[in-house]
Amino acid sequence: MTLLLLQNHGAVAGTMSRDNAERAVVRESIEIIRDGAWSADISGDERADACSAFILRQADVGAFFKRASRVTERAYSHDLDATNCYAEGRARLANGGVVKWKIDQARRGFVSMPDGRTIYLYCPRCQTDWFAPN
């Protein structure tokens, strides 16, 4: 099974259209490197020990990639809620390239592509006990 990462650059209301070129991620290749991690990059009152409960499974990451919409870097960095808790890992593209990904507890994520581009994602429809309430 493959998941699609969106590659277009046309923005409408802060999100990207799904109608353009796509790149497939091999679902079985999703590797979680860090789970329940804490980052000081986000200002907030979350403590590192609170992040230990944010544990994503491979299926959760796959569902995130499948359901998430692409957003602009501006929306990701300034407009969407953020959290200190995150998971990160790697995945293989159908063409053999490897991407790095990161998903936070506020349902924001990004994928660093082999060519250096970053795809920013947001998934308000993603549901699991580990994500913060919408």
Regions found by a protein language model. Give the residues of each.
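Disulfide-bonded cysteine motifs in exported proteins
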Residues: E46, L80, T118-L121
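C-terminal partner/receptor-binding element of secreted or periplasmic proteins
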Residues: M16-R27, P114-N134
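Generic marker of residues within folded, mature protein domains
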Residues: L3, N20-E22, D79-D81
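Mature extracytoplasmic domains of secretory-pathway proteins
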Residues: A48-K102
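Bacterial N-terminal signal peptides
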Residues: M1-Q7
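Short, compact, well-ordered microdomains
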Residues: A94-I119
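N-terminal trafficking/processing presequences and adjacent post-cleavage segments
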Residues: N8-K66
